[in-house]
Amino acid sequence: MAHKKAGGSSKNGRDSRGQRRGVKRFGGEKVRAGNILVRQLGTHFHPGNNVGLGRDYTLFAKIDGVVTYESSGARKQVSVYAD
């Protein structure tokens, strides 16, 4: 006979990975066309000059250049200017 009672199995012990959102390229950084600038949920940052908006609100560079973060009133936008 066993002298230890069987241990139960836990139903916890799992966790999902984070969604890896956030700013990927900061102001002043050089980028190439197609580089992801920001991954976000909704338009926290709006696309400015030479920046595209993906289906999941990802902002990406349309041209090679330098990233700038600008704000006009309450709206923050990201632009890329050729260097």
UniProtKB/Swiss-Prot annotation:
NCBIfam families: L27. The keyword Ribonucleoprotein applies. It holds the Pfam family Ribosomal_L27. SUPFAM superfamilies: Ribosomal L27 protein-like. Belongs to the bacterial ribosomal protein bL27 family. This is Large ribosomal subunit protein bL27. One of its GO terms (biological process) is translation. HAMAP family: Ribosomal_bL27 (MF_00539). Keywords: Ribonucleoprotein, Ribosomal protein. GO terms for molecular function: structural constituent of ribosome. One of its GO terms (cellular component) is cytosolic large ribosomal subunit. Signal peptide: none annotated. Residues 1-26 are annotated as: Disordered. It comes from Desulfosudis oleivorans (strain DSM 6200 / JCM 39069 / Hxd3).
